[in-house]
From Swiss-Prot:
PANTHER family: RIBONUCLEASE H2 SUBUNIT A, RIBONUCLEASE HII
Family statement: Belongs to the RNase HII family.
GO MF, one annotated term: RNA-DNA hybrid ribonuclease activity
Cofactor annotation comment: Manganese or magnesium. Binds 1 divalent metal ion per monomer in the absence of substrate. May bind a second metal ion after substrate binding.
Role description: Endonuclease that specifically degrades the RNA of RNA-DNA hybrids.
Domain spans labelled RNase H type-2: 20-214
EC number: 3.1.26.4
Positions of a divalent metal cation binding: D26, E27, D123
The protein's name in its UniProt record: Ribonuclease HII
Names of the cofactor(s): Mn(2+); Mg(2+)
Entries under Pfam families matching the protein: RNase_HII (PF01351)
Keyword Metal-binding: yes
Amino acid sequence: MIRICPTVEEERALRAAGYRAIAGLDEAGRGCLAGPVVAAAVILPDAVIDTPDVLDGVADSKMLSPAQRADLFERITSLAVAWAVGATPAHIIDSHGILPATRLAMQVALLRLPRPADALLIDAVTLDNWPLPQRALIKGDARCLSIAAASIIAKVTRDRLMDALDACWPQYGFASHKGYGTVQHQQALRRYGPTPHHRRTFRPLCDWLATDAADEGLADGTGRSIL
């Protein structure tokens, strides 16, 4: 698969317009059956915008190996002017929907930045009523260096959270699939039922919960019926 190298064209255009704290934002975990959706905000320094080769290798996190992401995480966080993450748990995803939950995680990340942003570059979505200039870029994590950097921070952070959940719920294999709907994960769900970290409005889990209500019931993660 060909890796597309993100550029700093968007950052340079905003800088030419007078903005100096340009935050890239992206998320990880929108399509998972379990765990939070995690967003990251990253403000890169002028030195990186002027000479992006210092972050050579940064790309859409989905195109990188875990080892590459871990290495780039350290490089990005050491060079960034500011960075922060936000996470929205499964029960909020279920009650509000994945897109509002994603926006919430992004807003939390922005509020946690030690230096406030003055403009935003976001992968695919906009933050309604957020009082800053912003651009939503389709496939922004492949096109824009700041967004690609945020995608790596979000992915590594979320993977570490899922590793921690694996220590508490080892029967689900969270450390290997990170909450995505793999065959292994779906088999564990059918055997053990959902944990408090599973998204009960996501298919196929919501379908199983509905059909099992009229059947023998689905376990609650410990073998007890929840229906």
